[in-house]
């Protein structure tokens, strides 16, 4: 959450490129699994409310604020059953793309009227481009998990399954 205050670029209608602020939530979702990742995503959403928000309707609020953070925590751990590079990268990629799709739909449906103000003839193209901040924001996350020492750390981290078995 603290990393989300390190904004490298802030967009005019919300959203920003940060210093890998998604990484802790993605990592927790990967380590703890979808259930605990969902809970962490919801808590992360609540924390994000302290940074201010602007919304038009409850559906837009859900698509721009609630669902994107929940899917980051939930989907990052869906492939975590084995310690392979695909499981880590696949879960992270799925989570990031799902977050992007949430923002894209909200941008197209609710913010598309601003497309012409920014030189776009199409609300779809406008939303695709405007919300690409999510993909740019994900690049440092993928770079960091590609560093051999960090990749090795992820492989060694306990998964929730192993923790539950040890308690039994």
Where are the model-predicted features located?
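Small-residue faces within membrane-embedded alpha-helices
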Residues: 29, 37, 41, 45, ...
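Short helix-perturbing small/polar motifs within transmembrane alpha-helices
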Residues: 1-2, 40, 60-108
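Hydrophobic alpha-helical transmembrane segments
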Residues: 23, 34-42, 58-62, 89-94, ...
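Juxtamembrane/transmembrane-helix interface segments of polytopic membrane transporters
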Residues: 4, 103, 107-115, 145-150
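Alpha-helical transmembrane segments and their cytosolic interface
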Residues: 122-168
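Structural signal for the C-terminal ends of transmembrane alpha-helices
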Residues: 30-32, 74-82, 147-156
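Hydrophobic transmembrane alpha-helices
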Residues: 1-31, 36
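Interfacial aromatic-anchored transmembrane helix boundaries in multi-pass membrane proteins
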Residues: 3-17, 42-77, 113-115
